[in-house]
Each structure stands twice: as C-alpha cells, then as structure tokens.
C-alpha cells in the first residue's frame, strides 16, 4: 500500500509537470507579434535584403565625399577603373592585373602616342563617372519595383515607410494596418531618427509641384542625390550642418578637419587621426577652397561635390598624373602607371619593372 507521503510526492510531481506543459502551451499560443512593431525572428530579418535596396547608400561611386562628410578614399580608383574596380583586388594574379591595366592605358591613350595627357585623362574620368551614373540608374529600376508593388509608377511616403520598417524586421502587414487606421507606431528612438531624416530627404526629392509621391526619376534622386542639382544642394546642406560648429553655414579649415566624435586614445588611433587631419587639410586647401580665402561656402562645396563638373575632372586628371609623373613631363607612361598601380587600382602589382618589358 502506497504511503501518504509517497502519494503526496507523486501528486506534487504531476502538478509541476502539468504546470510546465500549460506554460509551454501559453507561450506557443500567444500571437507571434504582441505589438504591430515587434521584431520578427532573426532568420527572417537576416534573409530580408530590402534594406540595402531601399535605403540611400552612404557611399556614392564617383563622388568625392561620402554622405557623412568623410572623404571618399576610393575615388581615384572609381573614376579610373569604373565598373572594373572590383576586378582589381589584392588576391588577383598580378600578371593578369598588369595586362588589365595595360588595356585600360590603351583606351585612355586616345591618340595612341604611348602617353596619357591631362585632357585624355579628363575625358576618361567623365566617361567612368557616367558609367557609375548609368549603373545607379539601372539598379534604381529594380529598387523602385521593390517599393512600388502595385506598379502604378508612384510611391507614397507611407508605402516607403512600410517597406523600410519591414526591412528592419518589423511585421509588414501589421505596420500597414496601423498606418491605414492612423494608429500610433511604437518605434525605437534610433529607428525614428532615421525615419525623420529619410522623410526630410523624401520631400526634398519630390519635384514641384509637390504631390507627396515619388516617381522612378525622383526616387533615383532620393537614393542618389548626385543625379539631381536640387538634391546635391540638399546633400551639401546636410554635410555643412554636421560639420559647421559656429552656425554660419560655412566651413573653416579647423571645422573641416575636426576629428570624429569618440576617438580612442591610443597610438593606433592617433596615427589614424594624423592621417585624417593630413588628408582633409590637403583636400581643403588645394581643392575645395577654390578661391583660397580660408572659407568654404556652400557654393564651393557644391561645385566640389558635383561629379559631372568638367573643371573638377580636369583638376582631378592633373592631380592623378602628378602622383605618378616621375620625369615631370606632365604625361603618364605605362611604366609610370604600373609603378603607381596601388594609387590607380588599389592593388600593388609587384615586380612591375621586371615584367613590364617582357609583357608589353
């Protein structure tokens, strides 16, 4: 006969088991999303690539400055190699890359005199910049379809907002329902700040007369401000706003070279800081400050940022030649370009001198 103590112990164990089962049932029976904006599973968020398609990129190929005001470290390679930039990497076979570079040299050397002049380099830079422009146009067609599912050729701010939040892992259907019913959206502070900035940019891209809708061309300007004079001005204002410390809507040298917030105090960080200051000081004094009065205005920065400015392209051509022009004849030979390949391609093609004559 079972003792009273054993019976009570068995009853207690059964109770705990049932309680555990009920708790599990409660968890799995709950809605997958208590609030309309609760983040979905990591797998789903990771698989969602829409964010890269619908967010304006920080980096713009062929533009001298990033959206955050940093100098574009790959600008020289982008305007010299165009779409072939990705083919030149550190792991590529040097002999193959030398041949690629020689083929590019032949294309730039329009008069076939075995030398590249400033005017030839200028023409080439404009062609490569146009190549980047066309690439952005082609990509925009795909990105626009992602935010225009009904295919009516126009996208409202709310439609874009839904897609943006979905790209962040929020439930798209529930967000759409909340917006439709004018219900509050519970969004974290960081995401809301991004949305506010995007909204300002959205309405700037809405060409007059404003209808709060973006067509495909306006959406291109939204993603790529370098394609629109009006959006280029907006981009310049944003950069000056972030760098201008005294609120005069102009940039002094000290404002332009100010170190990024949160600099780490160690030797490696100090070396990075030194590079930052040196590069920005050189660019400010030699290029951006066109009249060399020690002040950069919005107009000067706008001209500097314009990738289709032929005068800028000529200046860039002269600078690129000066870097590798060892004999100071204001022209570039194939040997000089190969020797300074790291500047033009981002890859150092080793043993160029030993191989150049036997290959070319």
Curated annotation (Swiss-Prot):
Annotated organism of origin: Xenopus laevis (African clawed frog)
Subcellular location: Golgi apparatus lumen
GO molecular function ontology, one term from the record: calcium ion binding
One GO CC term on file: endoplasmic reticulum
Residues reported in the UniProt entry to bind Ca(2+) 1: 109, 111, 113, 115, 120
A GO BP annotation: calcium-ion regulated exocytosis
Full protein name: 45 kDa calcium-binding protein
Keywords attached to this entry: Calcium, Glycoprotein, Golgi apparatus, Metal-binding, Repeat, Signal
Residues the record lists as binding Ca(2+) 3: 244, 246, 248, 250, 255
Keyword Lipid metabolism: no
Sites where the protein binds Ca(2+) 2: 148, 150, 152, 154, 159
Glycoprotein in keyword set: yes
Primary localisation category: Golgi
InterPro entries listed in its UniProt record: CAB45_EFh, EF-hand-dom_pair, EF_Hand_1_Ca_BS, EF_hand_dom
The family this protein is said to belong to: Belongs to the CREC family.
SMART domains, per database record: EFh
Residues reported to bind Ca(2+) 5: 325, 327, 329, 336
Glycosylated position list: 33
Limits of the EF-hand domain: 96-131, 135-170, 231-266, 276-311, 312-347
Signal peptide: 1-29
